[in-house]
């Protein structure tokens, strides 16, 4: 375990939202170094489907696996053919593009791409209907979640979060 203790990638966690309800996307990202306990846990998620939750590998097209290898786990149980099509189609393409955007933009070093495993947990609204908007939202949210994972979260950033806590907002919260 100490082998990965000071790794700047392994175990980094980020999240992001992009788009508008119901076609937006919420992404959680966990970055892992291949061979680490974190990577083993991510691969365990891929090997552990359960009813309605079907982990898969993000592909840019059929047979074209994204690098860094990206394991995707849906947060919303599947079963409805429309939601399945949007999750495995628009959402998957957006996630694949977002990962590659992070590499293209230098958020992740292309030289490290084969040594990194990314676990993405994706939430797709069951009432999503605009595949183009879903793909765009997943692309933007994935890139942003990866950037959040590798970004600096120093004491100043934490103080800013604390200061903003009373202005918290969520598109699904309708209360006061």
Predicted region positions:
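Accessory interaction regions appended to the cores of large information-processing enzymes
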Residues: 1-176
């Amino acid at each position: 375990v100490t082998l990965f203790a000071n790794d700047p990638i392994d175990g980094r966690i980020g999240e992001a939202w992009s788009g508008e309800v119901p076609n937006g996307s919420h992404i959680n990202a966990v970055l892992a170094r291949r061979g680490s306990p974190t990577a083993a846990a991510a691969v365990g998620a891929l090997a552990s489907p359960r009813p309605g939750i079907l982990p898969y590998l993000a592909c840019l097209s059929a047979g074209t696996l994204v690098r860094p290898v990206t394991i995707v786990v849906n947060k919303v149980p599947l079963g409805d053919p429309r939601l399945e099509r949007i999750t495995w189609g628009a959402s998957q393409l957006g996630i694949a593009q977002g990962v590659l955007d992070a590499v293209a933009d230098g958020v992740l070093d292309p030289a490290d791409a084969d040594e990194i495993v990314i676990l993405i947990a994706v939430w797709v609204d069951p009432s999503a209907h605009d595949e183009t908007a879903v793909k765009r939202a997943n692309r933007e949210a994935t890139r942003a979640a990866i950037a959040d994972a590798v970004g600096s979260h120093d004491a100043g950033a934490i103080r800013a979060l604390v200061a903003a806590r009373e202005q918290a907002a969520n598109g699904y919260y309708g209360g006061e």
